[in-house]
UniProtKB/Swiss-Prot annotation:
Complex formation: Component of the CIA complex. Interacts with Xpd and galla-2. Binds to microtubules.
Organism whose genome encodes this protein: Drosophila melanogaster (Fruit fly)
GO cellular component, one term: midbody
InterPro entries on file: ARM-like (IPR011989), ARM-type_fold (IPR016024), MMS19 (IPR039920), MMS19_C (IPR024687), MMS19_N (IPR029240)
Tissues expressed in: Expressed in embryos (at protein level).
Protein name per its UniProtKB record: MMS19 nucleotide excision repair protein
Amino acid sequence: MTTPTRATLEKALKSDQKLVNSATQIAKDLTAKAYDISALAEALGFALSSPDMEERVAGTNLLSAVLIALPQDLLQERQLEFLSTFYMDRLRDHHNVMPAIIDGIDALVHMKALPRAQIPQILQSFFEHTTCQSQTRSDRTKLFHIFQYLTENFQDELQAMAGDFVYGLINSIDGERDPRNLDIIFSFMPEFLSTYPLLHLAEEMFEIFACYFPIDFNPSKQDPAAITRDELSKKLTNCLVANNEFAEGTVVLAIEKLESELLVAKLDSIELLHQAAVKFPPSVLEPHFDQIWQALKTETFPGNDNEEILKASLKALSALLERAAHIPDISHSYQSSILGVILPHLSDVNQRLFHPATGIALVCVSGDAPYAADKILNSFLLKLQAADASSEQRIKIYYIVSQVYKLSALRGSLQKLDTTIRESVQDDVIASLRLIEQEEFDAKKEDLELQKAALSVLNESAPLLNEKQRALIYKALVQLVSHPSIDIDFTTLTVSLGALQPVEVQSNFIDVCVRNFEIFSTFVKRKIYTNLLPLMPQIAFTQRILDLVMTQTFNDTTAEPVRLLALEALNKLLLLADQRFIVDVQQESNLLHKLIELGQKTEGLSMQSLEQIAGALSRITQQLPLSEQSAIVSEYLPGLNLSQSADLYITKGLLGYLHKDITLDDHFERLLTDLTQLSLNSDNEQLRVIAHHLLCSMVNKMESNPANLRKVKKITEQLKVAIKKGDVRAVEILAWVGKGLVVAGFDEAADVVGDLSDLLKHPSLSTAAALGFDIIAAEYPELDLPVVKFLYKQKLFHTIMGKMGSKLANYCVHHLKAFVYVLKATPQAVIKLNIEQLGPLLFKSLEEHNEAQSLCIALGICEKFVAQQDTYFQGHLAHLIPSCLELSKYKAQHTMQVRIAALQLLYDVTKYPTFVLLPHKVDVTLALAAALDDPKRLVRNTAVKARNAWYLVGAPSPN
């Protein structure tokens, strides 16, 4: 193929589309080596050197378009030198040619074989013959991308240009106002500023960025990919702290702008100081510390009314101190300046400045714990030792001291604290804790806040306590745990001391509790369990505590209330323990057999104790290997009589969380029959719930074979017979069986759903049938349903749509209620796909004023769509708004939850465009006035929020 003729090229230059098509074809020819690019340049010479400016623009555009379309590794070094020389020469051309030249240069600098020495020449020519800011916005964007690419890939060549490139870059950026271009600049310049020497131009470079601070920019709401003000501000801050030579200017700039009355300017200034503290070395910032501290002190001491400014200021101060911590001279200088201001105010907790002083004090500790903590603790110690120190003052001081210890520990400096000071503080704390040992101490009159505060200190200082102090603490802990009315949690302290001093804790605390356990009241025994069980993971105490629990659980002489406590403790123990521990206990003591025997043979066991036994059996069974689970079922299940309460609870424990791979086929029919009969005939609601859950779980886990399905079919037929006799309980049982089938994905689930939907028109069972759909759709965390069919909720939805679709059109109230229950469990995406069909049903359910549960569900579904500004609901606000206004009124059938949900939905509606809301504004604002007087505070709060939002519809934006 030959080089394109002049006629072909002239034709290509006539329109933009033809130019693009020709450039693509020429690029393919060049890639195929059909001809050389020099031949193309020669053929295109008539246009490139034409006296007609428009033709030169078109010719240059074609050449640049070809370069852009070429692979980056196609052209050779000699060809690229020739092209770069051409483009450098063209930089002198008319301004209209510049866009095409910029495109060509952009393509050239990305070519793999371009001699690296050409880069400085291209930049020199550009800076000499044109300016970036004289180009259009889109061309400036291309130029900034070029600068970004060059700074990242040609560092040595650009540094060889010395100040020429830096100066050219400064001129290119200076005056840029477009936020997208600024985003590009602020993104790549921090890396450039931190790696390139700025020479004598550091001040000029800093001023280029300083003029943008703080960012004052509001993105267009119509821009789908708008750059936010916060993003720009963050990137600008990174530029201002990118070079150590900017330190002085950055500090001055931040402090100057911190005086602004605008919140956003203050926050940006504080964040700039924070980033300066993080990025600049302490030696660079030290000369400016006094200025920074004075500025931050204004915002933190006595403190700014704005919580956001206060937190940001403390964060900046913390970063400043933490960075200086590894240079003792600088750190101590900083700390002395700050502590000199705040320490006098730590001595009086009633002073107005005490609270802000403590905040700054903790920041000092987080920065240089050994230095600051000693001085702060000593200041508190002087106050604690004063004769007029009250309990209220001690409480406040103790909580601050505990934070000082905690921060010191986090910084690894706890052991570095002055021994004399900390031991004196700890003595005072222990003395406060031991006040409970005094005979005149009346626990009923004391609020125990002092003791709680003392424990907070001891929790953090446990590693520092000496032997004498620990001995006193053990006595106090025994007194606390054995006190007949005091109940304070000190498990953190016992766990810490147990890890540090296991022998002492064993002899001075655990043994004392165990030895006297029998004589203590039930209240005290509960406290002992509470404080001993967290020590179980520590191997030194495991057996001792386990022996106590086992003895109290299985001793024949144990009273029922005490046994219940022991069973509760056993369950907590099994929850805390790992699998290996549980398996070991089972193997060593045959715990599972003991629990079953306890349930069956102990007279007078309460339902609560049986529930605890079932829970323990479940936790043990879950942790055992499948072979052992199967053996346990085979051993114990045949002998269980489900009509006995104890055996039912034991069955719950054994089967409730049995692994799904263990077959129950041999017992399946008997269990189904017994559980069904129990639920039909028992008046004990607790036993019926257990039966329902077991039925549901067993059906869910059953193996899908004809025999099992026949057994389930037999039970459902029995239930239908009972239903025909008007038995409400049979409807409930059918729903639970249906739930197990639905979740597992059995086809037979459709029959149960159909039966329930038919009952919705029954004169006496319709309510029970509607609640049956709630049972099927609701989530029950305590129910074990391990077989979960993929997308079963969607299948349930479509099944019910098929069964009830025609009936829903008639708007039977029970059909609506049942369908709302199903929608609660249906994924929102499925509802959205069917919203044209479901929308009228939702609106009708709101108008029917059903019972509270279904109303709350319907309102919740609507709210999810409205919060996302769904277009369907936008078109039906005329239906939605009146219903919500009616439901927001105080009426007997409108519970507090319904009224709040309706008002919240009305609030979310205000997110829709103003033109949609204006026709409703007056009516809604007037109607909501009644809700402002609702008897319930939470309803009134939501009403105020909703009414304010409607009142502001159409008001001018604050921006």
